[in-house]
């Protein structure tokens, strides 16, 4: 009954909480650009087709790489099939950013395969963020509770990823504009500095020439004074020498 299913879900969640793994997947960070997506679904499921169509025809033109890891989405073999798909993804863990587990609608009883302890424990401890879109508005499974992010439909899962990439693209565009504006401001500042230098250079040259002319005139004046003093000294010495010669002359 539905009551039994709800009780079983609570028991599994309590067990996972006691084991300390209930929120491990939720604690992972979705990469900045989650564009490499491992999809666990049925190849013939309408939900899988909706998911791929939504990604491929997003209005932003963003690229997404998706790879399907087929699994049964209803029946008694859901647990075994999804676990096998997760094992295959785990073997290539570095090739993907996120895991998306999706299926179309169906009866609530068809979701029982997603309410098992083994599947919930595996997803809770999976090394990549898991996004689930396996039910409708009123459906909530144990898998939904342990997944990083739970949405209602495959289309909503696609929109979540598109929105994430669009946010990053918008941020990068804003950053690019700020860098461009900063570059223009620096160029304008340098242009003004060069213009200022261009107006100052003639004045600087004129002042340097004036200073040099003044220094030259001062040096010329000093040289004349030194020369006059030297000539006067030499003339005085010559006069003294002539006087001595005259005093020593025998004709005197």
Regions found by a protein language model. Give the residues of each.
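Charged, elongated alpha-helical interaction scaffolds
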Residues: 136-252
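Flexible glycine-/small-residue-rich
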Residues: 41-44, 70, 103-104, 132-134, ...
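Hydrophobic transmembrane alpha-helix bundles
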Residues: 26, 60-69, 101-111, 134-140, ...
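Structured core elements
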Residues: 38, 100-101, 131-133, 237
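Venus flytrap/periplasmic-binding-protein-like
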Residues: 124-137
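Phosphate-binding glycine-rich loops and their immediate beta-loop-alpha structural context
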Residues: 4-110, 115-126
